[in-house]
A protein has these predicted regions:
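Extracellular jelly-roll beta-sandwich "head" domains, especially the C-terminal globular C1q domain
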Residues: 1-119
Length: 119
């Protein structure tokens, strides 16, 4: 589990050649309003896959990607904007994932673009 503000990013083995990424609220009794954009590039031909969750309340497990290939076959990005349920302030981060050797070498990098702002 990787804490991302008021959300938790969960990373699990998906199959023999993939990992699974999901989000949940750190406190499931306090859902978090979020905007999520996921982009993946995978395979030898560079297939592109995108997913958008706009203005979505996240409390329990929300799957972001069921199949992230873990043999150096996929570049994976998540742009995540979330509103703190207690302060109503917004934060945004980018999460980059790259997984190799059947998940034995998985790197997840988090960069915060801003925290504690209003719109």
């Amino acid at each position: 589990d990787i804490p991302l503000g008021k959300l938790i990013l969960n990373v699990q083995n998906g199959s023999s050649s993939s990992i699974r990424l999901s989000l949940r609220a750190a406190n499931t009794a306090a859902p978090v309003l979020a905007d999520v954009r996921r982009t993946s590039i995978y395979g030898g031909l560079g297939a592109v896959e995108v997913q958008t969750l706009d203005n979505t309340k996240i409390s329990t497990r929300t799957v972001i990607d069921d199949i992230v290939y873990d043999q150096s076959e996929e570049m994976h990005w998540i742009r995540l904007r979330q509103q703190d349920p207690s302060t109503s302030l917004w934060s945004m981060c980018e999460v980059r994932t790259f997984s190799s050797k059947l998940g034995a070498r998985t790197s997840i990098c988090v960069d915060w673009l801003y925290t504690g702002v209003t719109f």
